[in-house]
Amino acid sequence: MKRNRFIAFFLAFLAIAPAVARDVLPVTGSWINLFYQDERNKYSNPMDMDNTDPVMWRAKVREMKALGIEYIVFMATANDGKADYPSKLMPLAYDARRESPVSAIIDEAAREGMKVFMSIGWAENQDDNLRNPAILNRQLAIMEELAGLYGSSEAFYGWYLPVEDCLGPVLTDAAVVAVNKLVERAHKLTPGKKTLISPYGFFCCRFDDPNFAKQIMRLKVDIIAYQDEVGCVREEFPMPRLKNAWREMKKIHDRTNIEFWGNCELFSWEKGTNSRQSALVPAAMPRVLSQLAAATEGGVSRIISFMTPGIWSLNADRFPLGQPEVSERAAQEYLAWRNGDRTLKLLEKSLTGTLGSNTAAIASVAVKNGDATFLTDGITGDENPENAAWKRFEAGYNEITVNLGKADTGSIFMRLLNCAKRGIGVPYKVYIYTAGDDGNYSLAQIKEMAQHPNSLHDTWIEPLLIEWSTSVKSIKIGFQSTTPLLIDELYLR
């Protein structure tokens, strides 16, 4: 009887205990692009570099490993009728006296214990249309040739099928037929190997249409890694809609045997969006972190990305792929988060709703000419400046004063919205004044907030961490900015 009472108590406890959020998943897979196709590849595959150098690609594989990448996905193994592997179907895109880029990458991946998805594109180029029987048959021939060359490699994990069709509003019959035909051939050529697709169109999916789920369930593919389209900016503020899309797609995948992965885009645009005349450049780390948090909370089992090589860079001195300086900084900021950087970890917790605040220790919060209760009400905004949780501070100098109940050491974490396209930025200087029991303020520190260069199209939540190691009773935070500011919450730690 005692045992039964204990079980009943334990089950009751589980019913009332707060849910524990999953740890935000890191990026463990990435596409790798071998060819310069247009201006989008300006930094990832520079025209003035030898993009067929096997030494470079081996170095990039090791770099991917250092970033925590386990899965490498070839974007394409051929382009414009030339192959980056020892093909008998078409001419070579590299010097035949050297190791091919594809061979170098898959061999180095095997050495590093990584897994590779081989691409069967392009039959012609990045505009391959699988509704054309000649294109489909050519991709099948490429698959057969690649299976013979690399099917026995330790690193060969499966196939990436570049069937970049649109999910929405409902996946077409033609797309389903094309995918399933490729999957059938792949499983016949390489039994036990996985097949992967990564469709776009999350922003226009009709989840309320019963045919939408039916079409997904008809697919015979092993893995779908959905493009989150945040980098592509298919809508002005994609994050609020994206969170719901992940949840809805998870419900569908729970009724299938298809693995549910996320493809979180790491890039932004140097000029216009979705243009072949605009280079891909690194997105700000807070934007990327929000994408990872949304995909994790949406239930994906793994996050892969387009893409780390040429967007993030760890070997810029020898092989300078990526936007100068910015790609290096992006890689270091990502690794800082992986290694527990406090500011980014606090942002992560705030994004997942698991960041607590010691509001009981705050006696009062004040702002000039306004109500400051919003700063400690526990209500946070999303990546949309029209969300009512964001409170506006005009350009110039603004102050927030936090009075503690008693003198203590600690830290304050704040969230600001960065939305350059709406004229909302972050302060270029933050002044921290502290006071003890006597109420006399003195300047304790000045923080400079980095202004990310690739803010033309994106909106993200910018973290600000203020720490003090001496016992203080009041903190005054001054912001100097040339644009209006949006702030939603203040956390006392």
Regions found by a protein language model. Name each.
Residues 121-127, 143-173, 304:
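Active-site groove signature of glycoside hydrolases
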Residues 341-407, 417-426, 444-458, 489-491:
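Disordered, acidic Ser/Thr/Pro-rich linker "stalks" and the adjacent N-terminal cap
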Residues 97-112, 131-158, 215, 295:
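An active-site-proximal structural segment forming one wall of the substrate-binding cleft
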Residues 477-484:
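Short beta-strand-plus-loop segments that form exposed binding edges in beta-rich domains
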Residues 54-123, 174-195, 239-242, 248:
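Aromatic-lined substrate-binding rim segments of carbohydrate-active enzymes
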Residues 22-70, 75, 201:
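Boundary/entry segment of secreted carbohydrate-active catalytic domains
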Residues 228-235, 258-344:
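Substrate-binding cleft of secreted/luminal carbohydrate-active enzymes
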Residues 154-167, 200, 209-240:
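Aromatic- and acid-rich polysaccharide-binding/catalytic face
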